[in-house]
Amino acid sequence: MRQELAQYFSVDPTQITLYWKGRVALYAILKALDIKAGDEIILPAFTCVVVVNPILYLGAKPVFVDIDPKTHNMDIEKIGSKITPNTRVILAQNTFGLSPDLDEILKIADQYNLTVIEDCTHGFGGSYKGIPNGMIADVSFFSTQWNKPFSTVIGGFAVSKNSDLARKLTEYEAELIRPGLKDELTIKTLFFARKRISSKLYWPAIELYRWLSKNNLILGSSQGDELQKPAMPASFFKGISRSQIAIGTREVEKVTEYIDHRKSIAMEFDRLLLDLQIEPPFQPDYAEHTFLKYPLLVKNREEFFNLAHKDKIELGDWFLSPIHPVISDYDRFNYPYGENPIAEKISQHIINLPTNFHVNDEQLSEIIQFIMRNRDGIYHSYNEMVKSC
């Protein structure tokens, strides 16, 4: 898998390190950068709490920047006001598969002597000005969780263009906890199960899976403790398993096919929304969007989900809050609720249409019919949402 990824990114295999989860890759990168207590990391206020946690594990401070409502990426014009003498890193996230304007972020970083980390957990397969996501800044990290275009059930990896960072990450990789037999069996079981879940079974399957993982009864994207407090689990710093490597080695070959499928589905959704006079997601000229998720703003999210549940339509809920999926007691994770109004408002109204490889022609037709039936529950634009709230 390391060799295949190196070939995909046109880098040396020594520049790639493999992990149990993407968040472990981020932790290793921050550690390699010698991030410590008191250091500040700038990141978008529209992310997952498991991205925030590694910052807190090292005693550093996450500093949140509001988002651009068109791209759902960090608003570059608001970064400067967040920089202090303690700022060390800007975390540049590819939200839903869309790269931010990295040239502008790198200009800011150069001005203040900061490191830019590309958060490509959504962005595998996309590009910025023709360059693959993850290959612009000195270092990047990726997630290979089950809902990503390149998946090893769970997992992650880092790509470092900086030789010193690559060496440190390789040293840390040798220190990672080795997955046990239970981990190997769990990966194989989840891979088998996911391949067989149809859209009709999506809601009961996802509800059961989330409940089991929240209560630490099954391996999930996030365990219960990670969502309750920023205390690093004992087995957090874990390496990739043999089962993940075997799956990943096969799946790399299919990445282009998977991403082309997502783009094709997104184009159908674009056509639908334009026909309904609803603004489709913004696609800037500088980036190739891979549409990990297809975002849509709705008037009443709970009601919309209930309708989808009833009609057996798959929908996603990224992001329920600026630090998804946490929806209360934000100060536990150092998030200052009320300071990022755009992200906070969007996170109350956003849903995602699926673009994954399970969406065949029949399911696509069902989703389109569902959207047409419920068009009155969808905002035509971000500005309409703001005016009505």
Task: Please report, for each region that a protein language model flagged, where it lies by residue.
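Conserved PLP-dependent catalytic core of the aminotransferase class-I/II
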Residues: 175-181, 222-223, 256-281, 303-310
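Active-site phosphate-binding strand-loop segment of PLP-dependent enzymes
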Residues: 70-171, 352
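Short beta-strand->loop structural element characteristic of the AMP-binding/adenylate-forming
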Residues: 61-71, 316
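Conserved PLP cofactor-binding pocket of PLP-dependent enzymes
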Residues: 179-185, 268, 281-285, 301-340, ...
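Alpha-helical membrane-targeting segments
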Residues: 179-249, 253
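Conserved glycine-rich beta-strand-loop-beta hairpin in the small C-terminal domain of fold type I
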Residues: 230, 236-252, 263-270, 280-295
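Phosphate-binding glycine-rich loop
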Residues: 2-40, 49-58, 64-66, 131
